[in-house]
Amino acid sequence: MSNQHIEELNDQQIVRREKMAALTEQGIDPFGKRFERTATSGQLNEKYADKSKEDLHDIEETATIAGRLMTKRGKGKVGFAHIQDREGQIQIYVRKDSVGEENYEIFKKADLGDFLGVEGQVMRTDMGELSIKATHITHLSKALRPLPEKFHGLTDIETIYRKRHLDLISNRDSFDRFVTRSKIISEIRRFMDSNGFLEVETPVLHNEAGGASARPFITHHNAQDIDMVLRIATELHLKRLIVGGMERVYEIGRIFRNEGMDATHNPEFTSIEAYQAYADYQDIMDLTEGIIQHVTKTVKGDGPINYQGTEIKINEPFKRVHMVDAVKEITGIDFWKEMTLEEAQALAQEKNVPLEKHFTTVGHIINAFFEEFVEDTLIQPTFVFGHPVEVSPLAKKNDTDPRFTDRFELFVMTKEYANAFTELNDPIDQLSRFEAQASAKELGDDEATGVDYDYVEALEYGMPPTGGLGIGIDRLCMLLTDTTTIRDVLLFPTMK
């Protein structure tokens, strides 16, 4: 520790270090050792919820708990405190004549934030609060910094995101939200495993960005002296496994996209991608609906959910609508009709739809109309299918109308939650679409990808008809925890 650091310590930090030294002089390790507890706060509160003060007095049940000291009050020979563990808090009642002078001094000198082990009898106070009447106290770890202001919790948004450890200590709602996130991911796994899918792991470092339209992070592999990219999707590797005969695979993992940040976007995020041989996009719609309804029922219970004051009927069958029909319903423009690029551009100008340089086909303009007019109207769970082929380089063309693909996106509360399609398994068609993407990249489309010749070669060995799916897990967590920013469901969001 440098002298400069010592000089920067405030009065509280200095006092805490003095107490640390005093513990050492007493032969007590300030940072403790293994401690065996017999119960958590949650277990005790659940087990004795219906027991009165008299009941507990007669039972004479003992318990050993451990956790962080969050409150402390009292004077003389009696004190009260609250110990916090991962399930919540429980009060401890400490009497000098019950724990002994040495033990009582440990309690008396303990600072808020310190970790203590407490053994004692389960009781209920005159006020009705479940408590532990301590018979022995063990010092477990010294906190050298004071906690955030104890009564109001941590409220500074920047600190909440930059110092999540303090947020978790101070804000129980935040702690519970991340427990829910963990349950959501566990339930997704449970659903996929029970439906015969195999969980796999694919590379994070790729030679060529692919599987999505996004700008990648670029890094350098020193040993091979080559530039590589962090994956923007897991798609192309997972489909290689379908070629290899695995038939049903999925991966839950981090994806990296070198793009802007807002309420629903973080440069690194978690997704699930899944691929099922011998299925099409309609089968995958059923799978997607099944995943989301299973997770919602497990985490939130039966019935609709409430998101920011809006009732979402997530327990009912999801609406299904073709993109062209959705655009027609809102704007009155019928893109089913054959039209030239010039006619489509004129319609866009008439409706003030921004036109990008790489919008070189009617399909690009249909997609722009959808994004401009339809997305913000999609509140209830809605599958929008039939995306133009130009914006779906990995999706199979529709048999009836090859201008469109057998692709869908799931929207809830105006946001996209899933993207899926009947996979393109024609290597010749795939190569031409990769080449079209490469051309768009040259015209300035930063999200367009290059040509992955190795993937095309894999397709040439034959891939069965396949349906594929990607779900943004962070957005699903936002929906099911009623939060409005992705930073509230990421333990460590990207910060400037």
Curated annotation (Swiss-Prot):
<dbReference type="InterPro" id="IPR002313">
    <property type="entry name" value="Lys-tRNA-ligase_II"/>
</dbReference>
<dbReference type="GO" id="GO:0140096">
    <property type="term" value="F:catalytic activity, acting on a protein"/>
</dbReference>
<feature type="binding site">
    <location>
        <position position="409"/>
    </location>
    <ligand>
        <name>Mg(2+) 1</name>
    </ligand>
</feature>
<feature type="binding site">
    <location>
        <position position="416"/>
    </location>
    <ligand>
        <name>Mg(2+) 1</name>
    </ligand>
</feature>
<dbReference type="InterPro" id="IPR018149">
    <property type="entry name" value="Lys-tRNA-synth_II_C"/>
</dbReference>
<dbReference type="InterPro" id="IPR045864">
    <property type="entry name" value="aa-tRNA-synth_II/BPL/LPL"/>
</dbReference>
<dbReference type="GO" id="GO:0000049">
    <property type="term" value="F:tRNA binding"/>
</dbReference>
<dbReference type="InterPro" id="IPR034762">
    <property type="entry name" value="Lys-tRNA-ligase_II_bac/euk"/>
</dbReference>
<feature type="binding site">
    <location>
        <position position="416"/>
    </location>
    <ligand>
        <name>Mg(2+) 2</name>
    </ligand>
</feature>
<dbReference type="GO" id="GO:0016740">
    <property type="term" value="F:transferase activity"/>
</dbReference>
<keyword id="KW-0547">Nucleotide-binding</keyword>
<dbReference type="InterPro" id="IPR004364">
    <property type="entry name" value="Aa-tRNA-synt_II"/>
</dbReference>
<keyword id="KW-0067">ATP-binding</keyword>
<keyword id="KW-0963">Cytoplasm</keyword>
<comment type="subunit">
    <text>Homodimer.</text>
</comment>
<dbReference type="InterPro" id="IPR006195">
    <property type="entry name" value="aa-tRNA-synth_II"/>
</dbReference>
<dbReference type="InterPro" id="IPR012340">
    <property type="entry name" value="NA-bd_OB-fold"/>
</dbReference>
<dbReference type="Pfam" id="PF01336">
    <property type="entry name" value="tRNA_anti-codon"/>
</dbReference>
<dbReference type="InterPro" id="IPR004365">
    <property type="entry name" value="NA-bd_OB_tRNA"/>
</dbReference>
<keyword id="KW-0648">Protein biosynthesis</keyword>
<dbReference type="GO" id="GO:0000287">
    <property type="term" value="F:magnesium ion binding"/>
</dbReference>
<keyword id="KW-0436">Ligase</keyword>
<dbReference type="GO" id="GO:0006430">
    <property type="term" value="P:lysyl-tRNA aminoacylation"/>
</dbReference>
<dbReference type="Pfam" id="PF00152">
    <property type="entry name" value="tRNA-synt_2"/>
</dbReference>
<keyword id="KW-0479">Metal-binding</keyword>
<dbReference type="GO" id="GO:0005829">
    <property type="term" value="C:cytosol"/>
</dbReference>
<comment type="similarity">
    <text>Belongs to the class-II aminoacyl-tRNA synthetase family.</text>
</comment>
<protein>
    <recommendedName>
        <fullName>Lysine--tRNA ligase</fullName>
        <ecNumber>6.1.1.6</ecNumber>
    </recommendedName>
</protein>
<dbReference type="GO" id="GO:0005524">
    <property type="term" value="F:ATP binding"/>
</dbReference>
<keyword id="KW-0030">Aminoacyl-tRNA synthetase</keyword>
<dbReference type="GO" id="GO:0004824">
    <property type="term" value="F:lysine-tRNA ligase activity"/>
</dbReference>
<keyword id="KW-0460">Magnesium</keyword>
<dbReference type="InterPro" id="IPR044136">
    <property type="entry name" value="Lys-tRNA-ligase_II_N"/>
</dbReference>
